[in-house]
Structure formats: structure tokens, C-alpha cells
């Protein structure tokens, strides 16, 4: 005989009305009790004293829920190794100080899957054990690696629609690609990116400064920046800056030595290539092996523009397969592309700049290849970090990013939603304004920026030291 129990509206669990199922329910209750008891200890190792800037955003959301009953469904997604589990742990320990501890739940969804437990079953058992009404009472639910739950998007949608639970769920960068449109309208999507130098300084030196990117880059206002620049660089060493360029944008670089960081990055790449990529698009093993070779080619410190034809020939794969592979690596947020400035035809025909979103991937691959990091390498890393900063700014403010494909053309062109253009040139030494002025004339830009060694404004050109630019976002 089969009996149906209503758990949430439109969601049913079928259980057999015999002693065997009763035994399973007892085992589930035992599991939930044991899990809740051991969670504080398990998460304590992730509960770092220093917190990423994203923590403050999540903490504010939790406070609004506790104080004003403003529930939310927040999806944190991003590349492996960026500290999503640490953020959940920090929010878990904070929330337990604000409401009854047993109303803060954390589940690692891969562990539930390993134990063949569905999230809805776990919540039903929790509700029965503690006598808590899921529909009305305040509960904070933290879910790590939500993609391990089958039909996770529908489960979260129904939880959000039918209960009073505040939910934060984490997942890989590919997570957003597979959610239903209904959930997309309900959830707040919060991407977790690699760290900027400003965040790195806060976590390593306890130096906290505000972002001055718009004030400096868009408005040429250097008054506050000059004070910040002088103050910061009186407290740190040149090696601090170079270490950030090499490995500092990844949170685990804060605690591990450099060799261990490179090993962790390589392990992370293996998981992304052979696991995450296959969740987005099915490739055979030979193609996935070629993906690794592709990363090595893209890490060339002297190369930055790539044609699909030359890459496909080198890798001995079809051009279409290569395009699909790069597209998936971009969706996994391992890479991002910068298109040439100009017409749609030019964007398609001309080579793209392909950058690593976490710049330390490049140095980890250099380490594997035995590359000694010299000034040329640091120049390559600097341009990649500048590209990463501009990428972040474009994501937040709706700008777009291009480069000028001709020889001697601008490294970057920042384009506002109103089609105002800023030409940007990057280098470690003193740079002349001649090249920038020519690029400005060609693309009809209103402003130019030279990231080098100087700090001044001459006409419509801003000169900013590269070490100062790193402080802006």
C-alpha cells in the first residue's frame, strides 16, 4: 500500500506504510540530529576572522530577514576556490548569534546525495524533530553545491513560494545556465569573483580603503586618490604588489605558500575541465585533454590575441569544436573574451583577446612549464589584472570592453552605455601620449588613460601609476 503525505503545496513524498519505511524515517531523523549537532564543528574551520567584501552584503540581507521578515533566495555562483563555502560558514556562525541556533541549517548537497537524501525529505524530518513550522517561522537555510540536488531549481522555487525560509545556495559558474526562468525571476544572483588588490590588502594588511574607480577613471578627480596612494604605499612593500599579481586574487593564497597555491590551482583546473565543463556540454575525453593544452597556449606571456584557425591547427581539432570549447570555458568563468573594436563584421573576423578571469591560473601554468617570471611576465600579468578590473566594472555598470586590433592600437577601449569611449594603454614604465592620442582620434574617444609610472592629468589624458590603478576597485 502506498500513502501520500503532503509536505509542501504541489510537492508530495510517497512512502510505504510498513515497518521498513518507518525504519528509514528513524534513520533519517538520526542523520538530521547528528548533522545539526556536528555542523558547527565542521564549519568552524571555514569561519575565518577576516571576511571578503561579499560577506557584508549577505550579512545585511540576513539582518533584514531577521528584523523585518524580508525573505530572499540568493544564488552565489562562481569558479571553484573563490570562498563560497567560507562565506556560507561565516554567515552560518553569524546567524546563530542572531536567532535560535537550531533555526540555522546548513547542508552540503553532495553529502545529501551521497546518503541518498533529498532536500525536501531532510527539511520534513527537521520540521518534525524540532516542531518547527516551515511555512511561517523564521529559518535560515544555507545550501552548498546546490547542483547536486536533482531538479534543484524547481525545489528552490517551491521552497521560496511556499515557505518563510531565507535561502542562500552556492553552485558552480555553470549553475545559472541550467536554472528555470521561473527561478531566475525569484532569485537574487550574486556572482563571486576573484579578489581585487583592494580586497587583498584588507585581508592581508588590514588596510581598508573605498573604491575610487569612478571618481578617478571617469571624473579625473585625484584629490582623494593622492592621499590614499601615498598612505597605502608607505605601508606595503613592492613584493606585496608583485605577489598579488602572481597569486593574490585567489582566497586560498592568503594561507598557503606559493608552491601549494600553484598545486591547488592545477587541481582546481583538472576538476573544472573534467567535471564542470562536462556539465555544460558533453565533450569526449580527447577534447577535454586538448582543453588543457589550450590553456597552456593561452598562458603564453608574449601572446594575447588569438585566431581560432591558428589555435585549432596547433591543437589539431576542428575549428567548431574549439569555438565550443572556448565558449564553455567562458561560461565556467575560467576565461573571458575581449572583442576588437569596430563593426560586427570586424568583431567576427579579427582575433579576440582571451584572458584568464583568475589571473593566477596563468602563473600556475607558467610554474608547470618552468617559466621564470621576469619583467615581460609581470607586464603580461599587469595587463591581465587591468583587463579583470575593467571586466568587473563593465559587469557592474553596463559598460562594454573592446581593444583596437591594428598594430599600435589601444590595449583597451571602455565604452559607456551612451557610447562615450575611453582609450586605455597599459605598461610598466613611462609611456608617451602619442599612441593614445592617435587611438583616441581613430575611435573618436573623449578621453585617454595611460597606466604606467606617472600621476597627472594633461588635457584629456589621465596618467596613473599601475600600482595606483590596482587600488581603484
UniProtKB/Swiss-Prot annotation:
Coiled coil: none annotated. Residues 1-19 form the signal peptide. It comes from the Archaea. Pfam families: AAA_14, DUF4143. Keywords: Signal. GO terms for molecular function: ATP hydrolysis activity. InterPro entries: AAA+_ATPase (IPR003593), AAA_14 (IPR041682), DUF4143 (IPR025420), P-loop_NTPase (IPR027417). This is Uncharacterized protein MJ1637. The lineage of its organism: Archaea, Methanobacteriati, Methanobacteriota, Methanomada group, Methanococci.
Amino acid at each position: 500500500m502506498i500513502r501520500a503525505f503532503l509536505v509542501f503545496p504541489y510537492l508530495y513524498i510517497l512512502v510505504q506504510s510498513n515497518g521498513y519505511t518507518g525504519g528509514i524515517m528513524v534513520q533519517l531523523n538520526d542523520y538530521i540530529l547528528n548533522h545539526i549537532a556536528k555542523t558547527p564543528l565542521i564549519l568552524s574551520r571555514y569561519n575565518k576572522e577576516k571576511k571578503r567584501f561579499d560577506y557584508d552584503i549577505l550579512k545585511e540581507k540576513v539582518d533584514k530577514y531577521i528584523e523585518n521578515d524580508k525573505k530572499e533566495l540568493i544564488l552565489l555562483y562562481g569558479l571553484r576556490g573563490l570562498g563560497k563555502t567560507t562565506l556560507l560558514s561565516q554567515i552560518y556562525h553569524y546567524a546563530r548569534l542572531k536567532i535560535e541556533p537550531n533555526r540555522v541549517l546548513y547542508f552540503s548537497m553532495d553529502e545529501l546525495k551521497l546518503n541518498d537524501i533529498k532536500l525536501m525529505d531532510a527539511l520534513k524530518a527537521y520540521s518534525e524533530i524540532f516542531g518547527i513550522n516551515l511555512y511561517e517561522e523564521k529559518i535560515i537555510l544555507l545550501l552548498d553545491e546546490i547542483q547536486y540536488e536533482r531538479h534543484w531549481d524547481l525545489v528552490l522555487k517551491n521552497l521560496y513560494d511556499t515557505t518563510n525560509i531565507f535561502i542562500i545556495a552556492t553552485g558552480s559558474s555553470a549553475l545559472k545556465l541550467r536554472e528555470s526562468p521561473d527561478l531566475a525571476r525569484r532569485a537574487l544572483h550574486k556572482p563571486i569573483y576573484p579578489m581585487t588588490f583592494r580586497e587583498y590588502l584588507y585581508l592581508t594588511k588590514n588596510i581598508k580603503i573605498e573604491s575610487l574607480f569612478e571618481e578617478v577613471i571617469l571624473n579625473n578627480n585625484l584629490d582623494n586618490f593622492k592621499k590614499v596612494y601615498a598612505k597605502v604605499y608607505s605601508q606595503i612593500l613592492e613584493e606585496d604588489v608583485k605577489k598579488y599579481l602572481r597569486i593574490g586574487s585567489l582566497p586560498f593564497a592568503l594561507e598557503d605558500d606559493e608552491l601549494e597555491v600553484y598545486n591547488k590551482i592545477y587541481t582546481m583546473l583538472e576538476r573544472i575541465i573534467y567535471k564542470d565543463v562536462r556539465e555544460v556540454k558533453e565533450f569526449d575525453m580527447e577534447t577535454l585533454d586538448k582543453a588543457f593544452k589550450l590553456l597552456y597556449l593561452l598562458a603564453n606571456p608574449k601572446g594575447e590575441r588569438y585566431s581560432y584557425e591558428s589555435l585549432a591547427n596547433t591543437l589539431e581539432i576542428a575549428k567548431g569544436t574549439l569555438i565550443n570549447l572556448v565558449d564553455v570555458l567562458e561560461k565556467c568563468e575560467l576565461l573571458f573574451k575581449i572583442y576588437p573594436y569596430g563593426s560586427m563584421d570586424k568583431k567576427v573576423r579579427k582575433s579576440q583577446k582571451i584572458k584568464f578571469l583568475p589571473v593566477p591560473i596563468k602563473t600556475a601554468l607558467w610554474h608547470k612549464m618552468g617559466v621564470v617570471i621576469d619583467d615581460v611576465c609581470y607586464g603580461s600579468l599587469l595587463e591581465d589584472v587591468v583587463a579583470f578590473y575593467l571586466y568587473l566594472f563593465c559587469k557592474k555598470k553596463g559598460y562594454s570592453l573592446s581593444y583596437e586590433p591594428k598594430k599600435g592600437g589601444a590595449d583597451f577601449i571602455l565604452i559607456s552605455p551612451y557610447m562615450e569611449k575611453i582609450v586605455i594603454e597599459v605598461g610598466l614604465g613611462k609611456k608617451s601620449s602619442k599612441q593614445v592620442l592617435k587611438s583616441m582620434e581613430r575611435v573618436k574617444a573623449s578621453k585617454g588613460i595611460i597606466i604606467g609610472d606617472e600621476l597627472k592629468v594633461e588635457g584629456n589624458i589621465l596618467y596613473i601609476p599601475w600600482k595606483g590603478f590596482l587600488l581603484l576597485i
